[in-house]
UniProtKB/Swiss-Prot annotation:
GO terms for cellular component: cytoplasm. Keywords: Cytoplasm, DNA-binding, Repressor, Transcription, Transcription regulation. GO terms for molecular function: DNA binding; DNA-binding transcription factor activity; GTP binding. GO terms for biological process: negative regulation of DNA-templated transcription. Belongs to the CodY family. This is Global transcriptional regulator CodY. Residues 207-226 bind DNA. Pfam families: CodY, HTH_CodY. It comes from Streptococcus pneumoniae (strain Hungary19A-6). Disulfide bonds: none annotated.
Amino acid sequence: MAHLLEKTRKITSILKRSEEQLQDELPYNAITRQLADIIHCNACIINSKGRLLGYFMRYKTNTDRVEQFFQTKIFPDDYVQGANMIYETEANLPVEHDMSIFPVESRDDFPDGLTTIAPIHVSGIRLGSLIIWRNDKKFEDEDLVLVEIASTVVGIQLLNFQREEDEKNIRRRTAVTMAVNTLSYSELRAVSAILGELNGNEGKLTASVIADRIGITRSVIVNALRKLESAGIIESRSLGMKGTYLKVLISDIFEEVKKRDY
């Protein structure tokens, strides 16, 4: 029991990770490595859309084809759909099973390979799947207890992180709406014309040229840019005689201006 408690503490310590670590490209490499080291297996975590969130390989089991999934950090749709249909931990799936993570073309090399898939969900929301696999040794009850704990820990983190991201998105959209509301009719026309000049989210523009084209004064454009820049929506830099370099920091401005039909 003490041995299991020690392993459990190692896994739950992942909750102490910072938000900055969760914003990494593969935020759950640490917990998959801990789990792989404790249980002696390969491990990976995918979200409900199949994006790879973290993985660690103790054993070489992938072919070049499957290795590509880990390189691109996205799993095939059919596998993801199957994983999302698993509502309780499915343990020790043989290589012949459709949800085995062992590549079809290498199953003869790993005839005793076993896959375990644990759903990651919190409050009825499906967030992803935790997948572990071994070449030839069955996952015992103690291993499965740790997997259940790990999936719960990851689920709590994912849900909290998702809520934080949702709150950030709301604050961002609110900032854009408030900034656009401060613009006059002429300034809105100017902003619409300016955004149309950009190549994606950034580009070079000449205020006097835009002003002449839409029939407003250059000062209107300058005032509009100043308001958006003070709100943190854009940043600009004078290029002297060449015009002004503009970069959009909050892309929601495109949709907000479009909604106003300017």
